[in-house]
Amino acid sequence: MGAVKIFNRSKGLNTKDDPARIDDNELSIAVNVDVSPEGRISRRKGYSSIFDSGCHSLFSAGDYMLAVVSGKLSMVEKDGTISVVTDVVDSHTIRYQMVGPVVYGISPSIKFIIKDKIFYPWVVGENNGVTTDRQFYAPPYGQLIAHHSSRLYIADGSVAYFSEPFRYDLFELFPGHIPFGRRLSLMAPVADGMWYADNRDAYFISGMDPAKDIVMRKFSGAGAAEGTGILIPGEKVGSGRMAGSNVVAWCGKSICIGGPGGYFKNISGEKLELPNANTGSGYYHDGRLTFCLHSY
């Protein structure tokens, strides 16, 4: 009697159905394994430790990395050399946005600029334009930062503030903001608008100028855990129909993708039940999305 093949390829995780009822090619649990696009299961590759001090708020700035190491904002070179940038940092997570060669950093307690590897406070600039009675302020503290259509956006609680075009040191806080109902956990740009989310729902706001009338679409139940948003080249998603623009992926109760024009898709399907999470992180490399979720 010839061999009978009972397992050809894995469909991945199924955490919603009873393990006794899932298909033969589904997994009820997976620890440190990869499932290839062809359904092959392999052990996940290991990693090398660069330093063993407690760290958080990691950000790649090209030829160096920023991170809070032992409570201090530090610069980590490619060879693992660590130098302290500033020690005026507490336990809050820092979010970063790179515009050209300049890194802008924000948290609920610190805001700064790093240019040519030098730390500067992020303060209000001078308005050198036409005479105006408008009142400009320094950027607010906040939990999220993003860049879109020549403006920097900062989320402080449930409000998204935006800078003047090409003047990232000038914020007209009123009326220069977009209010939401709950604390924002995602803020990410695509070609023709911005994606936002709180812990329950997601929103797409179309248009390039937030100072003008905006159109908002709501996607109920598509909330994000703060920190999980990732920008991905559009040609890497699906059939490549969104080539030329970024799309954003995030993770909450489901794994979602948002693209230009309000394109939305839940890619975790009906068989993956994720735990409740307040915060997390996301990573995209070599065609793979990786999310880490944290509940507290």
Regions found by a protein language model. Give the residues of each.
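Hydrophobic or amphipathic alpha-helical targeting/insertion segments
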Residues: R95-N127
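N-terminal beta-propeller domains
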Residues: M1-T81, T131-F204, M208-D209, L293-Y296
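Short, surface-exposed beta-strand-loop junctions and turns on beta-sheet-rich folds
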Residues: L73-S74, G80-S83, K111-F112, F119-P121, ...
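Hydrophobic beta-strand segments that make up the repeating blades of beta-propeller
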Residues: M65, V103-G105, M194, V247
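Repeated scaffold domains used in trafficking and secretory/extracellular systems
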Residues: F51-F59, V88-P101, G129-S149, G181-P189, ...
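Short acidic-glycine loop/turn motifs at beta-strand connectors
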Residues: V69, E77-D79, S107-S109, I114-I118, ...
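Beta-sheet-dominated scaffold domains
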Residues: K5-S10, R182-Y296
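Beta-propeller fold detector
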Residues: S83-D87, P121-E126, E172-P175, D213-S220, ...
